[in-house]
Curated annotation (Swiss-Prot):
Organism: Aspergillus nomiae NRRL (strain ATCC 15546 / NRRL 13137 / CBS 260.88 / M93)
Gene3D superfamilies hit by this protein: NAD(P)-binding Rossmann-like Domain
Cited InterPro entries: NAD(P)-bd_dom_sf (IPR036291), SDR_fam (IPR002347)
Protein family membership: Belongs to the short-chain dehydrogenases/reductases (SDR) family.
Catalytic site: Y234, K238
Protein name: Short chain dehydrogenase rstn4
EC numbers for this chain: 1.1.1.-
Binding-site residues for NADP(+), renumbered to this chain: K88, D111, N138, Y234, K238
């Protein structure tokens, strides 16, 4: 019967955490959307991205598009859109340049179902001598299927975690060599990872410590017969993304590096994230946040200043803890094991963390790239 229900109702009805009535549970989550998560909207007079270079992924529709629109209104010198569908991205570019003619918008191909596409995207930024002040990694998706990518991973896992985390690591050198203009990036460069409150609706068996060339966490998403439901693949991918963001922020702090990492979620918004239906529209009307509110939460995560922001997980626009599992002893072990696996994964693709995670002297950029 549940299989005939539209999303996200089916996801709620079949949720294994349905009996969790803490703030992490799915029912409190659904009830909270209309009444919380209203950070003050950024005003150009208070927040300016002048002289900054901003990257947004997943900006051709939904919350990502709205976040890109709101960020453009804050006046960055260059707004880069990483997108799989270049035709849609070009349409967004034209609209943004019409609405904010003082902002240069650049579009580049980025398909998170293809790790080589991530490499080509970042290599293109390097070739253009682009240095980032802000990277908002918003791209993600949900589909109730078990599609695999050409790289051999579950599509849900690769898009929502692996390629996003890989992109984040590869962007770090570009964030660390940012502009030095006085008005640019007073908070320092920032990396924003978009997870989901759904990370709290799952756990993850802690694997044995990985041996050399053994990646038990990542490899578990290559075996179709053991993937589990699409829902749980999505939940676990978002859990892993939150954990890698936490560990990355901790290590950047230890190394006294300038880049701040913020983990955020826009909550349930009235977007095209789920397939369209009359019931879905009704559910959105009753309990979803608006696209504008979701975009504002992204912009808040990208621009809010203060020492409490680095390493923060923002829910409803406020710093809070991750799920009980993520913050507990098993989650902390998983976080460390995941870091080791990502280090090996990067090395397998020719990138050593020791060369990525090192302070670089800021570079002066005289004009738009």
């Amino acid at each position: 019967m549940a299989g005939y229900l539209p999303e996200p109702l089916r996801m709620m009805v079949t949720n294994p955490a349905i009996s969790d009535f803490t703030s992490d549970g799915p029912l409190p989550y659904a009830l909270r959307q209309k009444f919380t998560g209203w950070p003050p909207p950024p005003a150009a007079a208070d927040i300016s991205l002048a002289s900054q270079t901003v990257l947004v992924t997943g900006a051709t529709s939904g919350v990502g598009l709205e976040a890109a629109r709101q960020l453009a209104q804050l006046g960055p010198r260059l707004l880069i859109l990483g997108a799989r569908n270049l035709s849609k991205a070009d349409g967004v570019k034209r609209q943004l340049e019409q609405d904010t003619p003082h902002v240069a918008v650049q579009v580049a191909k980025l398909d998170l179902e293809d790790l080589s596409s991530v490499d080509r995207f970042v290599d293109g930024l390097h070739a253009s001598a682009i240095h980032l002040d802000l990277a908002l990694l918003n791209a993600g998706f949900f589909a109730n299927d078990d599609r695999m990518t050409p790289d051999g991973y579950s599509s849900l896992f690769q898009v929502n975690f692996l390629s996003t985390a890989y992109l984040a690591f590869r962007l770090l050198p570009l964030l660390q060599t940012t502009t030095t203009a006085p008005e640019a990036s007073p908070q320092g460069p920032r990396l924003v990872l978009v997870t989901s409150e759904a990370h709290a609706w799952t756990t993850f068996p802690v694997p044995p410590e990985p041996a050399e060339n053994s990646l038990p966490i990542l490899s578990s998403f290559r075996q179709k017969e053991s993937l589990g439901s699409a829902d749980d693949q999505y939940y676990r991918a978002k859990l892993l993304l939150a954990l890698i963001g936490k560990e990355l922020s901790r290590r950047l702090t230890t190394m006294q590096m300038a880049t701040s990492v913020v983990i955020t979620t826009p909550g349930f918004c009235a977007s095209n994230f789920f397939p369209d239906s009359v019931m879905t529209r009704l559910i959105q009307l009753i309990s979803a946040r608006s696209i504008q509110q979701g975009g504002a939460l992204h912009v808040f995560a990208a621009t809010a200043q203060g020492p409490q922001m680095h390493g923060a997980y923002l829910r409803d626009g406020k710093p809070t803890g991750l799920s009980k599992f993520a913050e507990g002893p098993q989650g902390q072990i998983l976080q460390q094991r995941l870091w080791v696996e990502m280090e090996q994964f990067l090395a397998g693709r020719g990138y050593l963390l020791s060369s990525i995670l090192k302070p670089s002297s800021p570079l002066q950029i005289d004009g738009p790239v």
